[in-house]
Curated annotation (Swiss-Prot):
It comes from the Eukaryota. Residues 381-392 have a biased composition (Basic and acidic residues). Its EC number is 3.1.3.16. Changing D148A: Decreases activity. It comes from Aspergillus flavus (strain ATCC 200026 / FGSC A1120 / IAM 13836 / NRRL 3357 / JCM 12722 / SRRC 167). Mn(2+) 1 binds at D71, G72. Residues 366-435 are annotated as: Disordered. This is Protein phosphatase 2C homolog 2. Dephosphorylating regulator for many key proteins. Dephosphorylates phosphoglycerate kinase pgk1 at least on 'Ser-203' to negatively regulate targeting of pgk1 to the mitochondrion, thereby negatively regulating production of acetyl-CoA and consequently aflatoxin biosynthesis.
Amino acid sequence: MGQTLSEPVVDKTSSEGEDDCCIYGVSAMQGWRISMEDAHAAVLDLHAKYTSPEETSTDPAKRLAFFGVYDGHGGDKVALFAGENVHKIVAKQDSFAKGDIEQALKDGFLATDRAILEDPKYEEEVSGCTAAVSVISKHKIWVANAGDSRSVLGVKGRAKPLSFDHKPQNEGEKARISAAGGFVDFGRVNGNLALSRAIGDFEFKKSPELAPEQQIVTAYPDVTVHELSDDDEFLVIACDGIWDCQSSQAVVEFVRRGIAAKQELYRICENMMDNCLASNSETGGVGCDNMTMIIIGLLNGRTKEECGDAAEFRGPGIRNQFEENPDDYDMENDRARGFSVRSGRIILLGDGTELVPDQNDEELFDQTEEDRDLPSQVQRELPDSARNEREGTPGPQSKTDATSKSEEGSSASTSESTVTPAGSSTSGAPEKSTS
């Protein structure tokens, strides 16, 4: 657990934007930590902003949006660099121009590492960051992940993980770490870093004889490709400041309640962060971290209002019906909460309903069982052939899976954007700061 303040910083930096493909809201909060080390990016039209005019398509069906969350550790410099540059670097890859978005994301993550190494300003830099990003077209989502920030898709009220957390104790990750000359002790790389993949962290990338994806810690991402359907409602990308406190399913249900209650997406993010904020700084780090959360609503040809109506009446996840008059619900929820008391924490459901649980913070935020099952959830969403095509470092897998895979291998509209270091002002979309 990092150093904490005597009182949390609950001011939030929030923004929103939309086009005919998707609508998003994002918010970031420093919380109990002594500094803000998160960054994020939101770009509604990646082609228009960062490719040459001849490469830019005016066809809305070919428009690509980009969203990313970068959770820094050991300082904020690498996270800020990532938030400002990853999307630009991805858009400059040859594979991006050829329409191979999956390869562009892989190449772009590694190119970001190289760009930092080649910049004299970062010669002695020791910090690093996670990277959870998504590129969204009208018909498809690409999710790239390095670290333990997470991307979760809401499908008719059910959580579908599109990434898995890269932890050193995972068998596939541990195998790479050991092969590169490192070790895992107490769930940490070389007894130090709690992640097995990250941008930066160059002290773990010093083996010149090894390729970048084979280093003790690598920036090489896993990429999940998802074909969109009418059942897909929204994507949530957030740092572990959220996921350490809430399960993926709980977040999806919370977001869906807010959408059904006609709340703005950035407001749902703010309410979720208030829920996750620890009532004090003695919870062992749970609820004390920086928090950043992006919700991307997938319009699928619908208006924002139609998406709200669909969330209210179809599928699981909504546990009560809402009256037509939204004035019956507390939509703003601006008053201070949570951190001022140790017991009687007020939990806000996504529709503004208040709940006072009996559990303490540690019991309330215990997601051990879900985290244990997360790798298998992601694997179930991918055919074996898709995972076999992933070169470099394998994703989470059992020893049996690893053996069988080894045997198989031997035998065979107007553009709008915001790019925001969390905690600073935004551009291209209205900024909202609340406390």
